Amino acid sequence: YSFRPADSSDGLQIYNISDNHEVLSGAANAGRYFGDDLDILILNGDNINDVSSLWQISLIYKLASRITGGERPVIYVRGNHECNGRYAADLPDYLPGKDGNLYYTTTLGGAFFMVLDTNCDMSDENLLITPAANFEELRREQTEWLNAQTYFGGDCTYSILLAHMAVPL
């Protein structure tokens, strides 16, 4: 296999998928729309129902593999469902980010991406989320990190902010 970095010479072909909740087939089929022209895959949260098993984490990689074959860059954004379950607190150990965080910046193909971790849509006291939840602290740390940022892709063709936003029903 061969990896091809994002190439913006003809614009960027980006596929952004969220909320497929462990249903890989439709998301993967849609993700192959660009074929070899795909530049960047964004997995924008809720790609699994929760993080109760390591097998579920593997589904995130399986989805990326079915779309990119390991040959294109993938950006991962945590969704609110990835805040629930036994392994939720360990998710940064298995997925890309920086410094053990799921909020980070990256530049690909002339595009600057800022990835925010909007974490959970429930309070830390809610029994449905992991007992190790401390999202108030995470939000404080992420706010400090955001306030310390000085580069926002000013020399890039595109500047893109990524976040998974849970909408209450």
Whereabouts are the PLM-identified features?
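Extended active-site neighborhood of metal-dependent phosphoesterases/phosphodiesterases
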Residues: 1, 58-155
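Acidic, histidine-bearing metal-coordination/catalytic regions of metal-dependent phosphoesterases
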Residues: 1-15, 21
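Active-site neighborhood of phospho(di)ester-bond hydrolases with catalytic His/Asp-centered motifs
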Residues: 15-19, 41-46, 72-80, 160-164
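Active-site environment of divalent metal-dependent phosphoester hydrolases
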Residues: 22-26, 49-52, 78-87, 121-124, ...
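A short acidic, amphipathic alpha-helical/loop segment
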Residues: 26-32, 56-63
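Active-site metal-binding motif and surrounding structural segment of the metallo-beta-lactamase
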Residues: 32-51
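Structural motif
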Residues: 40, 111-113, 158-160
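Short acidic, glycine-rich surface-loop motifs adjacent to enzyme active sites
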Residues: 150-169
